[in-house]
Amino acid sequence: DYTVPVGTAAVVREGSHVTVLAWGAMLSEAMVAAEEATKEGVDCEVVDLRTLWPVDIDAIVASVKKTGRVVVVHEAPKTCGFGAELVALINEKAFVHLEAPPARVCGFDTPFPYALEMDYLPLSGRIVPAIVETARY
């Protein structure tokens, strides 16, 4: 049996410079991006949210307190996506610990274009620059 506790995130990569929040299909891209960011001297902590509601705000806040920076990665459009809710929660619960504005790497604010899926999705090529920019803020 394999179960995932509802409302419990998992730190899947320890790091000290930037927290990267991801879930679902974007977790693997976040892991690739975190590894690539080490070439730029950035040590990422990757948190797999695993469930979005209830969200494990305590795990998110603990990681943001540790790193002072956060990048949220998800496939949905940036506007009204769940990443916006996460950033709002982080601002409410951990604002004083932020050393840089939270960043979101998301889909674009357009309908999902299946023929252009690889251009639409926030793959590591778009995630790494956001991580580096957030780390160097």
Give the ranges of each region predicted by the language model.
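Thiamine diphosphate
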Residues: 1-137
